[in-house]
């Protein structure tokens, strides 16, 4: 490591939709969406556990919706490509247990308040972040890491990526030594494969048709260090290789460790759970502030108490990149954004069944998500004039 002692290297990781934890996230959000299609006011907290050819679906769901949870789970597995016992779980043969109950009435009385107000479903802290270092206003490392496993999965599903199986991970190290010209230092990919495969051809395909392809998409270098399946073999994968659980990839789901995280997971939770809705709102606000030019980087923290609709606190960090006085940024936030639970749900249209698409390859950076819209730029630019 001596040769890198003066380098500024930052690393983030992502996982494919076939990773055991992501299987669980997708099933949790697929169930949430199916419930919301029938009952937009449903209260959902759904979690999934998986191991070799087995799923356990549990949680609390209060709703008038009638949903075949088992069928939803099997459909998700089929979409991923888990239709072979050798892969670690098989949509057609796996055992599924259902342990779903109704929401606690003690929680319900704190959520449903008068005058159309909604109390926070729990206490907690949430963060949102944006940076102008990429077109999606996300850090480069996590953005590239997502694209690698997304691209590899797409090629596998199309039959182009020979020998590949569903379970994959990526890890990207960005060299920020020249802060104005970041480059890729290292890419690591671990990709499950068939037992009878040509290792040299497999790795060559990954470097040329996945790693290099993605690097070029971002107009970045292709002379990075390469690590592919460092143990030498990755046949046993999926839930057979590791157990999976909803909510265990919260850093890959957000900013790849580049920003702080409050600890609350997203998948399987309806929008009255501020772990999800407030984190989305913080991202929405931070992204619009950065896009409006008020700072190069912004991180927003909020906190809530169960049963109370308004946040307990709001904190804004710009990492000394603000272009206007920090008090002006606070003023812009307080005058243009409402962090009450009911307002966040309305602003971001969070009663719609939109959550399955967030359950893989990150909850941020996708254009068609409401919290990614840039509809406050012009009004926020006005604050640059009065600073």
UniProtKB/Swiss-Prot annotation:
<dbReference type="InterPro" id="IPR022636">
    <property type="entry name" value="S-AdoMet_synthetase_sfam"/>
</dbReference>
<dbReference type="GO" id="GO:0006730">
    <property type="term" value="P:one-carbon metabolic process"/>
</dbReference>
<dbReference type="GO" id="GO:0005737">
    <property type="term" value="C:cytoplasm"/>
</dbReference>
<dbReference type="GO" id="GO:0005524">
    <property type="term" value="F:ATP binding"/>
</dbReference>
<dbReference type="InterPro" id="IPR002133">
    <property type="entry name" value="S-AdoMet_synthetase"/>
</dbReference>
<feature type="binding site">
    <location>
        <position position="265"/>
    </location>
    <ligand>
        <name>ATP</name>
    </ligand>
</feature>
<comment type="subunit">
    <text>Homotetramer; dimer of dimers.</text>
</comment>
<keyword id="KW-0554">One-carbon metabolism</keyword>
<comment type="function">
    <text>Catalyzes the formation of S-adenosylmethionine (AdoMet) from methionine and ATP. The overall synthetic reaction is composed of two sequential steps, AdoMet formation and the subsequent tripolyphosphate hydrolysis which occurs prior to release of AdoMet from the enzyme.</text>
</comment>
<keyword id="KW-0460">Magnesium</keyword>
<protein>
    <recommendedName>
        <fullName>S-adenosylmethionine synthase</fullName>
        <ecNumber>2.5.1.6</ecNumber>
    </recommendedName>
</protein>
<dbReference type="InterPro" id="IPR022628">
    <property type="entry name" value="S-AdoMet_synt_N"/>
</dbReference>
<feature type="binding site">
    <location>
        <position position="21"/>
    </location>
    <ligand>
        <name>Mg(2+)</name>
    </ligand>
</feature>
<feature type="binding site" description="in other chain">
    <location>
        <begin position="233"/>
        <end position="234"/>
    </location>
    <ligand>
        <name>ATP</name>
    </ligand>
</feature>
<dbReference type="InterPro" id="IPR022629">
    <property type="entry name" value="S-AdoMet_synt_central"/>
</dbReference>
<feature type="binding site">
    <location>
        <position position="242"/>
    </location>
    <ligand>
        <name>L-methionine</name>
    </ligand>
</feature>
<keyword id="KW-0479">Metal-binding</keyword>
<feature type="binding site" description="in other chain">
    <location>
        <position position="103"/>
    </location>
    <ligand>
        <name>L-methionine</name>
    </ligand>
</feature>
<dbReference type="Pfam" id="PF02772">
    <property type="entry name" value="S-AdoMet_synt_M"/>
</dbReference>
<dbReference type="InterPro" id="IPR022630">
    <property type="entry name" value="S-AdoMet_synt_C"/>
</dbReference>
<keyword id="KW-0963">Cytoplasm</keyword>
<feature type="binding site" description="in other chain">
    <location>
        <begin position="248"/>
        <end position="249"/>
    </location>
    <ligand>
        <name>ATP</name>
    </ligand>
</feature>
<keyword id="KW-0630">Potassium</keyword>
<keyword id="KW-0067">ATP-binding</keyword>
<comment type="pathway">
    <text>Amino-acid biosynthesis; S-adenosyl-L-methionine biosynthesis; S-adenosyl-L-methionine from L-methionine: step 1/1.</text>
</comment>
<dbReference type="InterPro" id="IPR022631">
    <property type="entry name" value="ADOMET_SYNTHASE_CS"/>
</dbReference>
<comment type="similarity">
    <text>Belongs to the AdoMet synthase family.</text>
</comment>
<dbReference type="GO" id="GO:0000287">
    <property type="term" value="F:magnesium ion binding"/>
</dbReference>
<feature type="binding site" description="in other chain">
    <location>
        <position position="19"/>
    </location>
    <ligand>
        <name>ATP</name>
    </ligand>
</feature>
<dbReference type="Pfam" id="PF02773">
    <property type="entry name" value="S-AdoMet_synt_C"/>
</dbReference>
<dbReference type="Pfam" id="PF00438">
    <property type="entry name" value="S-AdoMet_synt_N"/>
</dbReference>
<feature type="binding site">
    <location>
        <position position="242"/>
    </location>
    <ligand>
        <name>ATP</name>
    </ligand>
</feature>
<feature type="binding site" description="in other chain">
    <location>
        <begin position="167"/>
        <end position="169"/>
    </location>
    <ligand>
        <name>ATP</name>
    </ligand>
</feature>
<feature type="binding site" description="in other chain">
    <location>
        <position position="273"/>
    </location>
    <ligand>
        <name>L-methionine</name>
    </ligand>
</feature>
<keyword id="KW-0808">Transferase</keyword>
<dbReference type="GO" id="GO:0004478">
    <property type="term" value="F:methionine adenosyltransferase activity"/>
</dbReference>
<keyword id="KW-0547">Nucleotide-binding</keyword>
<dbReference type="GO" id="GO:0006556">
    <property type="term" value="P:S-adenosylmethionine biosynthetic process"/>
</dbReference>
<feature type="region of interest" description="Flexible loop">
    <location>
        <begin position="103"/>
        <end position="113"/>
    </location>
</feature>
<feature type="binding site">
    <location>
        <position position="47"/>
    </location>
    <ligand>
        <name>K(+)</name>
    </ligand>
</feature>
<feature type="binding site">
    <location>
        <position position="269"/>
    </location>
    <ligand>
        <name>ATP</name>
    </ligand>
</feature>
């Amino acid at each position: 490591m001596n040769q890198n002692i003066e380098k500024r290297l930052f690393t983030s990781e992502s996982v494919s939709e076939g990773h055991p934890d992501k299987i669980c996230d997708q099933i949790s959000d697929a169930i949430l969406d199916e419930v919301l299609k029938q009952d937009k006011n449903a209260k959902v907290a759904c979690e999934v556990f998986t191991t070799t050819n087995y799923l356990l679906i549990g949680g609390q769901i209060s709703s008038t919706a009638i949903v075949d949870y088992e069928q939803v789970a099997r459909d998700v597995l089929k979409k991923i490509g888990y239709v072979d016992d050798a892969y670690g779980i098989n949509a057609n043969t796996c055992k599924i247990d259902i342990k779903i109950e109704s929401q606690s009435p003690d929680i319900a009385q704190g959520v449903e308040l008068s005058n159309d107000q909604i109390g926070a479903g729990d206490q907690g802290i949430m963060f949102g972040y944006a940076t102008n270092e990429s077109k999606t206003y996300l850090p480069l490392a996590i953005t590239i890491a997502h694209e690698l496993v997304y691209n590899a999965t797409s090629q596998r599903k199309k039959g182009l990526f020979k020998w590949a199986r569903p379970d994959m991970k990526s890890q990207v190290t960005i060299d920020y030594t020249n802060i104005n010209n970041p480059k890729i230092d290292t890419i690591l990919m671990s990709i499950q494969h068939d037992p009878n495969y040509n290792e040299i051809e497999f790795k060559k395909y990954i470097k040329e048709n996945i790693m290099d392809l993605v690097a070029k998409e971002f107009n970045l270098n292709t002379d990075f260090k390469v690590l592919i399946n460092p143990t030498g073999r990755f046949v046993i994968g999926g839930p057979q290789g590791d157990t999976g659980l909803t909510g265990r990839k919260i850093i890959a789901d957000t900013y790849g460790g580049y920003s702080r995280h409050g600890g609350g997971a997203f998948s399987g939770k309806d929008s009255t759970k501020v772990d999800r809705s407030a984190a989305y709102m913080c991202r929405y606000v931070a992204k619009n502030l950065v896009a409006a030019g008020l700072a190069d980087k912004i991180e927003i923290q909020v906190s809530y108490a169960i049963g109370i609709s308004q946040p307990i606190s709001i904190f804004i960090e710009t990492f000394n990149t603000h272009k206007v006085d920090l008090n002006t940024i606070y003023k812009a936030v307080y005058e243009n954004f409402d962090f009450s639970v009911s307002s966040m749900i309305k602003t971001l249209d969070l009663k719609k069944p939109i959550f399955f698409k967030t359950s893989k390859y990150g909850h941020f950076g996708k254009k068609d998500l409401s919290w990614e819209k840039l509809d406050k730029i012009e009004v926020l630019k006005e604050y640059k004039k009065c600073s």
